[in-house]
Regions:
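N-terminal pre-catalytic segment of deacetylase/amide-hydrolase enzymes
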Residues: 2-8, 18-94, 101-114, 256-259, ...
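A broad, low-specificity signal for short, low-complexity segments enriched in glycine/proline
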Residues: 55, 79-83, 107-108, 146-147, ...
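Short beta-strands and strand-loop turn motifs
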Residues: 22-29, 93, 147-149, 209-213, ...
Length: 294
């Protein structure tokens, strides 16, 4: 009950205004044990049992520094969620949650464009509907868009109908502005379970994307702290979590991008990173890690 009240409170903030950053503290990853989830209502879309529609691939212009990728690896069987990927090479994906923001997201897009880098944006449906032009720009400049729910609620605390609306309304808003259907989603707060991960993948056709690098930028509104934490903890195959609704996070990005690029990292979208994922035993032991900072 307490978790549900927290989720409803935070959802109200998004209802008030998408362009205003949340002030509530964002909890860490919440993983509900399978036995607890089994006591909740069955979740799934009205077309349960039918195969999900294949995501429509984005058609975008190559960025100025298009990353040359190796051939895709064979998709791991029954893998519904990812915190990071096992890759041959210094490939990483940086992700931004909770936008688009009227001011900070365009600023971030400018920073990415100047460097020819790609990112993945996990958008809140209400904000996506409010800023269709920003959504179009995200796709036009080569970035990926994922589903982050309609109103930023903890999806493991809602019933079947509410979950369906959270997912489908967000997908509809994304398609309305971009013509695309997302291939991945991120549950708000990381609130998920093995059962939900399977449902999102098999019923909605979206892999669940968590993270392996978290600068806690929602809590520590300091650009230097945010950049330092990302730089120190990034590793090949990392999925980096950040939030484009915070000015301090966006201000940290030039240092993050320039330092990690100088160390040899290659920024790709989440879907590109997933395509490179392979069993750990197949990843070459000699995969070079980027040169440590002086």
């Amino acid at each position: 009950m307490k978790r549900l009240l927290i989720g409803l409170s935070l959802a109200g903030v998004f209802l008030a205004a998408c362009h205003t950053a949340r002030t509530q503290s964002e909890p860490q990853v919440i993983v509900v044990p399978p036995d607890e989830m089994s006591r909740q209502p069955a979740l799934g879309p009205s077309t349960a049992g039918s195969p999900p529609a294949a995501p429509t691939p984005a058609t975008v212009k190559p960025s100025a520094t298009t990353v040359s990728l190796p051939p895709p690896a064979a998709a791991p069987a029954n893998k519904h969620s990812y915190n990071s990927c096992n890759v041959d090479g210094p490939y990483i994906a940086i992700t931004f949650d909770d936008g688009p923001h009227a001011v900070h997201t365009p600023t971030l897009l400018d920073i990415l464009k100047q460097r020819g880098l790609k990112a993945t944006f996990y958008v809140v449906g209400q904000c996506a509907a409010e800023y269709p032009d920003i959504m179009k720009r995200i796709v036009a400049e080569g970035h990926e868009i994922g589903n982050h729910s309609w109103s930023h609620v903890a999806l493991n605390s809602v019933g079947a109908d509410s979950l369906r609306k959270q997912m489908e309304n967000t997908n509809a808003a994304i398609k309305e502005s971009t013509g695309l259907r997302p291939a991945t989603m991120r549950p708000p707060y990381g609130a998920t379970s093995a059962r939900l991960n399977k449902l999102f993948d098999e019923e909605y056709g979206m892999k669940v994307i968590l993270w392996s690098v978290d600068p806690l930028d929602w809590k520590n509104r300091n650009a230097a702290t945010v950049s330092s934490r990302i730089i120190q903890n990034t590793h090949p195959g990392a999925i980096i979590l950040a939030h484009d609704i915070h000015a301090t996070t966006v201000a940290a990005m030039p240092e993050v991008f320039d330092t990690l690029t100088a160390r040899g990292y290659k920024f790709v979208t989440v879907s590109e990173l997933l395509a490179l994922d392979r069993p750990a035993q197949l990843v070459k032991k000699e995969t070079p890690a980027p040169t440590p900072a002086n």
